[in-house]
Amino acid sequence: MLSVAARSGPFAPVLSATSRGVAGALRPLVQATVPATPEQPVLDLKRPFLSRESLSGQAVRRPLVASVGLNVPASVCYSHTDVKVPDFSEYRRPEVLDSTKSSRESSEARKGFSYLVTAVTTVGVAYAAKNAVTQFVSSMSASADVLALAKIEIKLSDIPEGKNMAFKWRGKPLFVRHRTQKEIEQEAAVELSQLRDPQHDLDRVKRPEWVILIGVCTHLGCVPIANAGDFGGYYCPCHGSHYDASGRIRLGPAPLNLEVPTYEFTSDDMVIVG
């Protein structure tokens, strides 16, 4: 057999590894060889991979320097000299710029400044919050015209003794009664055990001769009639409730006494209700 390597032009690199056998009288000078199949490495599964012996072979044994060039192989640099260490001196206070000195020497001054800034900020925030709350509460308060109607001044000399005068206050009838000495003694002598809503006469008046009441029946809100009823005080025509001259319920379905508003005597002849 005769072995001839085929070579032809640009395909020579591709065809150089091929051979063709031709029958002949001469023996081939070079026998065609078949590349041997590489053997697969056998791994020892019982041997730990992350051991001192396995890792020591991969560790760097000498310093490497990065090189760049056409004929220079690439390498890894494990040591850098161009790294800039960050400097925070601009953000530090002058008292602690020197790293060789202890910061305890200037700690009191630095703490005092921090406390001062915190205190000033707290006062400013509290003042702003106070103004905001004040404005919010003021917006919810009644206007000047409403406040003017919230109080009423009554001249007492216009009400004769033994008479009752009605006024309009906050949309409700207001009774002002000038009692006689007989009425005062009569109401003061009433036993509390006889009353449905026990209350002494002196607890309902500031001056014995003057009784100030809200003229609304405590049963269903009707307006009682003054100087009427079985007890000479007030009488509700709706359901027959009887009140005495002190405004206390004595007979009928009303459960409570007539309400006594807040009032104040500014002089002997003037009273302000509200």
Swiss-Prot record:
This is Cytochrome b-c1 complex subunit Rieske, mitochondrial. InterPro entries: bc1_Rieske_TM_sf, Globular_prot_asu/bsu, Rieske_2Fe-2S, Rieske_2Fe-2S_sf, Rieske_Fe-S_prot, Rieske_Fe-S_prot_C, Rieske_TM, Ubiquinol_cyt_c_Rdtase_Fe-S-su. Residues 141-274 are mitochondrial intermembrane. It is a single-pass membrane protein. Its EC number is 7.1.1.8. GO terms for biological process: respiratory electron transport chain. One of its GO terms (molecular function) is metal ion binding. The lineage of its organism: Eukaryota, Metazoa, Chordata, Craniata, Vertebrata. Its cofactor is [2Fe-2S] cluster. Binds 1 [2Fe-2S] cluster per subunit. Fe-S cluster delivery to the Rieske protein is mediated by components of the iron sulfur (Fe-S) cluster assembly machinery that reside in the mitochondrial matrix (including HSC20 and LYRM7). It holds the Pfam family UCR_TM.
